[in-house]
């Protein structure tokens, strides 16, 4: 019995030992340094950015009351959300004629480009920062000895900084257009039944855009985080060391010349 149980116990312990070895190899103190701590913030705020934008949904509406007593008051409720292709969202406009009951209408505008770019950038930032944290914590010696890793990290960090600025600004402008297109007054202005004398239209509840506004704020926070991290990543590159060597070179030579003059 003991001979049969020993292989099974060894098989059970081997995955645990591998996990323990992996956790022991992680240098958690790297998270206390700016290079690792900012990466954690970038990872978190990337989740907040694409999560708040990608999960947004709202509704707008209006009330149409026909002067014809045969028809009741019609309530129009239009649901919209990410990716904000408003021109594909349908709603039924009531008609006050006796012949037909309603007409299919669409919201105006397509704002999917800035929204999808914003969410895609957040997802890429999430995966890159997660991979960078693994390198910092597990393979930091390889990161410091191989000069290509800091150079690649610096170039990618600068690129993400630029893209976050563009994405946050573009999505901020797109969100402003979304607010204008989904405003209840815009909804009533687009319905022809509201321009005649056969009906009276009133605006419904204004859409709550709080989560979408926060997503724009998270976008600019990501920009500042990536911009601030550029300096700390640059310090790990060979370019920073060359700048220090060039700055110290003339001072050391002048000190040597002064020592030679004093000896003479």
Curated annotation (Swiss-Prot):
UniProt cross-references to PANTHER family, sorted A to Z: SYNAPTOPHYSIN (PTHR10306), SYNAPTOPHYSIN-LIKE PROTEIN 2 (PTHR10306:SF8)
Annotated localization: Membrane
This protein's name: Synaptophysin-like protein 2
Record GO cellular component, one term: synaptic vesicle membrane
Source organism phylogeny: Eukaryota, Metazoa, Chordata, Craniata, Vertebrata
Miscellaneous remark of the record: Was named 'Mitsugumin' which means 'triad junction' in Japanese as it was identified in the triad junctions in skeletal muscle.
Distribution of this protein across tissues and organs: Skeletal muscle.
Glycosylation sites: 213
Cross-referenced InterPro entries: Marvel (IPR008253), Synaptophysin/porin (IPR001285)
Organism: Oryctolagus cuniculus
Chain spans, region Disordered: 242-264
Transmembrane segments: 34-54, 117-137, 151-171, 214-234
